[in-house]
Amino acid sequence: RALAGLGNAVKGAVDVGVKAYDDYQNTKATEAYNLFQKAMNEKMYGENGIFIRQGEAAFDSTENMESALRDTAEEVSRQLKLNEYAREKLNRNIYQFSTRFMPKAMEYASEQRMKWADEQDRASLDLNFEGLLNNADDRHMRIMYLSTMEKTYNQYAERNGFSPAKKELGWKRVLSGAYSSLADKFITNGNLNAARELVNEDTLWLGGDQDRIRA
């Protein structure tokens, strides 16, 4: 009986020890994931973080996220000297984390590419519009600037998925606005004949722009 009691006591002590060890490893895995999340939050949202970068700096967001996930997991595992059980639990948590944030990084990179491209197109339209006005008296120069504006507008419209009707109307607005400003400049400079020539070309105008100049 004494030996049986001793055996039960030893078994009970072993069970308690196993449970304590399992709990310790579970807690180590939780600690590791806490450190992982803290480090990733800094890499994603801290100074110059993945989701803070703008424009061209954000084009590699997907690759940067992949590297950050891998490097951070290795750093945490090495820092805490996790055993196989704790590493497996950490890896499961990291996998769930990555299934949320990898697609987000891909989407962010795509959004930033489109935003950057749209900004370049708008800047091009503004610069060529300025060139058009600065060379108002040179017909060949005006044609050159307008041609560049049309190409730029077309690629902007295509990138943003404009329908043919929306694309046509949008370009008509750009063209009408450009010629309205051009006519205003002719009038201001006293070149009324040039202003009249523009007004008489019906294909250039949209809505009330033509009537405003005539008035």
Model-derived regions: residue spans:
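Non-transmembrane, interaction-prone alpha-helical and coil segments associated with secretion
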Residues: R1-A215
